[in-house]
Regions:
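Pyridoxal 5′-phosphate
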Residues: 1-404
Length: 404
């Protein structure tokens, strides 16, 4: 059981007023607000242990290095990875997917080979593969969905061929909220000896993720989606796979030795971390993971599911309401349209009431094309949101509806 009113005190921004209205922040799918402890960790890092990490012999450098590597261990424990060598720090989910798209394609794919994605992917899990398709001639196959917004698993099983080299799918849809059956997807792929990449950007903040249990070869997420700072993300990869893949970028830290004749690369995880790492971001991310860990991921999931069901009932009572995504298993996301009101107009007018939602295609244009629409209004909830806020949200939608 979460003490939501106590939790809200950890997030000073929630006390803000927008246009003289209390802020109702329902844009958590885009980014989450940051608890005071995370902001204080960033401040403390710059004030007390700011130094470039690794190889420094002085005290500050060694202290910063220790904090950074401790953060890596925190991520390892949070995901239940086998080794901290399997945790690569990136700038976010997008860079992590691009890293795998580049390195995996170079090492494991040739013209005519196939990657399976789904119709509900974020652009970050489409465009990197299209770049590789243009560069190397690989092919994308797409898993369709049914009218509820669930992946068509029978069709998925039929997509495999001897040229299929990777499955790359989202754990939770950022538009529909659909929680995909990723364990079943992984098992099916492994039946064909095909590795799997899971985009966990929308899953990690809301669900308990155990990469050892899932058994995916790669799993990626962003810090700012789980109450950490922007500019830091994570690539989890099975050690045997990361060992065989070539580096994504060249530069400092990812090398063992350099001469004009030859460069040898560093060991894991440093082989994939060229340049000065975001050691302040990594420690702040670790602080965010500790924070949600204290709340308990099971508690978070249960409360957010309660919010989702409450909000769904409230919105369904509004005339002209169309909610997109009716999957049996959903995360705390509602995408909708009301009558003929443009999503942008709805979002702008809700903003005047202090309500922050996301409007547009949500970086999922192929999904919008599949739905036959240009965009939606998206409300995405967090454990610091309340039913009272949902009541005000529903009243705000009704107020806007009556204006048109």
């Amino acid at each position: 059981m979460l003490d939501v009113q106590s939790i809200r005190k950890d997030f000073p921004i929630l006390d803000h007023k927008i246009y003289d209205k209390p802020l109702i922040y329902f844009d958590n799918g885009a980014t989450t607000q940051k608890p005071r402890c995370v902001v204080e960790k960033i401040e403390s890092g710059y004030y007390n242990v700011n130094a470039n990490i690794h190889r420094g012999v002085h005290f500050l450098s060694q202290a910063a290095t220790e904090a950074h590597e401790d953060a890596r261990k925190t991520v390892q424990q949070f995901l239940n990875a086998r080794s901290s060598n399997e945790i690569i720090f990136t700038r976010g989910t997008t860079e992590a997917i691009n890293l795998i798209a580049s390195s995996f394609t170079d090492e494991c794919m040739s013209a005519g080979d196939e990657v399976i994605v789904s119709v509900m992917e974020h652009h970050s899990n489409i465009v990197p593969w299209q770049i590789q398709a243009a560069r190397k001639g690989i092919t994308l196959k797409v898993i369709p969905m049914n009218e509820k917004g669930e992946l068509c698993m029978d069709t998925f099983r039929s997509l495999f061929s001897e040229r299929t080299k990777l499955v790359s799918v989202t754990h939770v849809s950022n538009v529909l909220g659909t929680i995909n059956p990723v364990k079943e997807i992984i098992e099916e792929a492994h039946n064909h000896e095909v590795p799997v990449l899971i985009d966990g950007a929308q899953a990690v903040p809301h669900l308990k993720v155990d990469v050892h249990d899932l058994d995916a070869e790669f799993y990626v997420f962003s810090g700012h989606k789980i109450y950490g700072p922007t500019g830091i993300g994570v690539l989890y990869g099975k050690e045997e796979w990361l060992d065989k893949l070539p580096p994504y970028q060249g530069g400092g830290e990812m090398i063992a030795s350099v001469s004009f004749e030859k460069t040898t690369f560093n060991e894991l995880p440093f082989k994939f971390e060229a340049g000065t790492p975001d050691y302040i971001g990594s420690t702040a991310l670790a602080e965010a993971l500790r924070y949600v860990g204290r709340l308990g991921m099971d508690n978070i999931a249960a409360y957010e599911d309660e919010l989702l069901r409450y909000a769904t009932d409230k919105l369904n009572a509004i005339d002209g309401m169309r909610i997109f995504g009716q999957a049996a298993h959903k995360g705390a996301v509602l995408s909708f349209l009301v009558g003929n009101i443009h999503h942008y107009d709805m979002g702008m007018l809700l903003d005047r009431l202090g309500i922050a939602v996301r409007t547009g295609h949500h970086c999922a244009q192929p999904l919008m094309q599949d739905l036959g629409i240009e965009g939606t209004v998206r409300a995405s909830f967090s454990f610091y949101n309340t039913k009272e806020e949902i009541d005000a949200f529903a009243a705000g939608i009704e107020r806007v509806r009556k204006m048109f």
